[in-house]
């Protein structure tokens, strides 16, 4: 084929001549691009199909590692309000239902119980009979809901003393069938006026349930290897809460006398160190004073057939400032939901409110 000559004498390129095939190589390249696009599309569709399959399988067959923890509103934790001073190494605290009387035991100094009014003014004392100070170590106190009498345990004498609401001594509590060498410590009442006492005596430490005739009607925990049980509390359903202090546990005994829930030591949220005093409020909250944890843990009591204590939170922290603690030992709650904490080594009782 010869090239045509233009009027200017320049040759016309052969590719411009009519009938010559144009861009054959370009068509092949376009086809290769289309094949690559189809391959990528198929690969993407396969990946999406696999992803959908995995999601469907997970939703159908998934097994949670642990029960879900419900979201807890911040209102489940009280805020610091004020403090009551005037006690030396307070170890126990109780409060009248209306909150107009605060009862505090002292483990040092005069070692008598003190009575304060709602404003933190001392209005009375609870002296053990024939008290000479060092012969007594009062520890925990509880208020009888039926008579407003105040019961105080004495670690040194192994006795429970009873006072009127203003602190006047009434009598020494005795069982209908006395137990030789019993060592009462933690005290609590239920709504019917039954008295719950942690007893450190014997080879098996335990909780005694005592009716209005001073008769032991139930014994809890003898087979659960309790070690220095301190606090005890009872909820409206009849569950009994015990701080098994030296084992670092909070145990919940059901109405059948068996452990239905517990919280122990560990590094996670809500795990205890040295649990001591306990208290319940009308909202089903359980307050646990933890001496080495330097604060108070809050749980929700188990309901229905539940076998767990839901963790609400913690308040406190180590220190001497308002709202911090140095070895809190006891906790109480009044009818209005105010929380009282014996802040032992800060020589005060802190009051928290919702």
Task: Name these PLM-found stretches.
Residues 1-30:
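N-terminal intrinsically disordered, acidic low-complexity segments at the extreme N-terminus
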Residues 56-77:
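Blade/loop signatures of beta-propeller domains
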Residues 78-85, 122-132, 169-177, 216-222, ...:
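A short beta-strand motif characteristic of beta-propeller blades
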Residues 85-98, 131-146, 178-191, 223-237, ...:
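Beta-rich, blade/repeat-based domains predominating
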Residues 101-104, 149-151, 194-196, 239-241, ...:
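Conserved beta-propeller blade signature
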Residues 107-108, 155, 200-202, 245-246, ...:
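Short loop/turn segments immediately following the C-termini of beta-strands
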Residues 117-121, 164-168, 210-215, 254-258, ...:
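Short loop/turn segments that connect beta-strands within beta-propeller blades
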Residues 326-354:
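Blade-level signature of beta-propeller repeat domains, shared across WD40, Kelch, NHL, RCC1
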């Amino acid at each position: 084929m010869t090239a045509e000559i233009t009027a200017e004498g320049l040759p016309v390129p052969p590719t411009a001549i009519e009938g010559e095939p144009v861009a054959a190589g370009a068509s092949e390249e376009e086809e290769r691009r289309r094949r690559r696009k189809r391959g990528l599309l198929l690969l993407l569709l396969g990946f999406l199909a696999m992803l959908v399959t995995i999601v469907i399988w997970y939703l159908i067959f998934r097994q949670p590692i642990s029960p879900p923890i419900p979201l807890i509103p911040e209102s489940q934790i009280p805020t610091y309000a004020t403090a009551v001073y005037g006690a030396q190494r307070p170890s126990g605290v109780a409060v009248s239902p209306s909150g107009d009387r605060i009862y505090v035991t002292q483990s040092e100094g005069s070692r008598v119980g003190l009575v304060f009014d709602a404003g933190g003014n001392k209005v009375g004392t609870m002296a053990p009979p024939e008290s000479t100070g060092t012969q007594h170590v009062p520890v925990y106190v509880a208020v009888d809901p039926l008579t407003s009498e105040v019961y105080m345990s004495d670690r040194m004498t192994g006795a429970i003393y009873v006072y009127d609401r203003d602190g006047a001594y009434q009598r020494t509590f005795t069982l209908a069938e006395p137990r030789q060498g019993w060592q009462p410590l933690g005290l609590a009442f239920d709504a019917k006026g039954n008295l719950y006492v942690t007893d450190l005596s014997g080879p098996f430490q335990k909780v005694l349930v005592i009716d209005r005739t001073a008769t032991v009607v139930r014994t809890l925990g003898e087979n659960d290897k309790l070690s220095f049980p301190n606090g005890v509390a009872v909820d409206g359903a009849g569950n009994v809460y015990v701080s098994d202090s030296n084992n670092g546990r909070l145990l919940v005994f059901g109405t059948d006398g068996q452990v239905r829930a517990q919280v122990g030591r560990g590094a996670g949220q809500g795990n205890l160190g040295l649990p001591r005093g306990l208290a319940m409020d009308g909202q089903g909250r359980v307050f646990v004073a933890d001496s080495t944890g330097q604060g108070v843990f809050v749980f929700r009591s188990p309901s229905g057939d539940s076998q767990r204590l839901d963790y609400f939170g913690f308040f406190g922290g180590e220190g001497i400032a308002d709202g911090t603690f140095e070895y809190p030992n006891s906790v109480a709650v009044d009818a209005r939901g105010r929380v009282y904490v014996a802040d032992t080594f800060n020589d005060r009782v802190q009051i928290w409110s919702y």
